[in-house]
Amino acid sequence: DGVALGSIIGQHYDGNFRYLVNDLLLNLPGLKPVSIGINKTGRNSRDFPRMVEAGFQSKNHMLMFPAGLNSRKRDDGTIHDIPWKKTFISKSVEYQRDVVPIHFGGQNSERFYRIARFSDKHLPFNLAMMFLVDEMYKNVGKHFRIAIGKPIPWQTFDKSKTATEWAQYVED
């Protein structure tokens, strides 16, 4: 989903975008120049806050995945994001950047969801992340529905709710 979104946003905005992504994905050809890597298993480098600040202060459109992880399959078989983190709200307000919600309609393989469930229950790290490239190649040539919502002005995120509550509001 991230690669497809980057392609669409990149074409529409002349390549002026950056991803905030798991740093493991920086090993994929072509992603490193357009990404700011987040270390999800250890500590971020001392340069990380500076890189994030530079990204948000630039003319680049920042692509963030508010859940921080891929969607998970629930016991009833439905696929849902885990609760969204508040970071996109706090960064929106801090850097006075509007939020444009995007919904990517697609799903990963049953194998991916089984690995994710096992990893979530039994491992201290996200093993499923290691299989994302495989999932991407399984979907080459397939069509997906991408819905791009109306921009939400950063001023919307006022003190009437906490950043976490605003994140839940945008997700809903």
Whereabouts are the PLM-identified features?
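Catalytic core of membrane glycerolipid acyltransferases/transacylases, capturing the structured
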Residues: 1-43
